[in-house]
Regions:
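Helix-enriched interaction subdomains in cytosolic or periplasmic regions
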Residues: 9-51
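Long, charged N-terminal interaction/targeting segments
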Residues: 11, 26-31, 51-161
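SAM-dependent methyltransferases
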Residues: 39, 43, 47-69, 214-217, ...
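General structural signal for secondary-structure boundaries
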Residues: 42-45, 102, 177, 186
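Cys/His-clustered metal-coordination modules, chiefly Zn-binding fingers
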Residues: 132-224
């Protein structure tokens, strides 16, 4: 629970910073205390109370105007968010991810590439580079499932579903001549589909079959 509380401290701090609050840390402490009171009064978990307080604050007209962040050109997902990185790519947003990356390398590479970090690690959010806003970052509650993570990222940055990228590496997809790649297409698929794409980075072949239709529906649902 302490990690979740720290994570929400970072979210409250970012929200208040964007609203140019003067007594920043006092404001964060007051919001945490308010969540504790709500938890005790309504008999709900502190995590639920923190979420409710944040959503209430973020939905206020003043904060809605100041809270929307500019859409990043590149995300960098921490080691535990491989699934989220794939879904962001499918939605047309470039997202880096490496399973074996440590925190120091994550910070260094994100700064070099001007990437926005996505993390479930509240302790990482305590790093000075993130606290001071040198590197843009968003903390995601670790209790969220992948679709909920995606929905939160979409809401925080006002993202839209764009042209899909390679879900494996994030490369742009380039239209291919069907006959030129015939040997790479499964025979049954070749007979009923004419449009194919290859990743400009890794060369992986894609087509919009029934699997993609399901993915597309879920992406648009997350964007609502």
């Amino acid at each position: 629970m302490d990690r979740i509380r720290k994570g929400y401290e970072s979210r409250f701090r970012a929200l208040l910073q964007q609203a140019n609050a003067r007594l920043l840390e006092a404001g964060v402490r007051w919001l945490i205390a308010k969540a504790h009171c709500l938890s005790e009064r309504d008999g709900i978990s502190l995590a639920t109370a923190l979420t409710e307080i944040y959503e209430r604050l973020a939905s206020q007209p003043y904060f809605r105007k100041s809270n929307l962040r500019s859409a990043p050109t590149l995300f960098f997902c921490d080691a535990g968010l491989g699934g989220l990185s794939r879904w962001l790519r499918a939605a047309g947003h470039d997202a880096l991810w490496r399973a074996d990356i440590d925190d120091d390398d994550l910070l260094r590479e994100a700064r070099e590439k001007s990437a926005t970090i996505l993390t479930t690690d509240s302790m990482l959010m305590e790093r000075r580079l993130l606290r001071d806003g040198v590197i843009a970052a968003l903390w995601l509650p670790p209790t969220l499932r992948i679709r909920q993570q995606l929905n939160l990222v979409f809401r925080e940055f006002g993202l839209k579903v764009g042209e899909p990228r390679c879900m494996a590496c994030g490369g742009e997809l380039v239209t291919q001549d069907k006959e030129a790649i015939r040997e790479r297409i499964p025979p049954k698929t070749y007979r009923w589909l004419d449009e194919y794409f290859a990743c400009s980075r890794c060369g992986k072949l894609f087509w919009r079959g029934t699997h993609w239709e399901r993915i597309s529906k879920q992406l648009h649902a997350a964007a609502i």
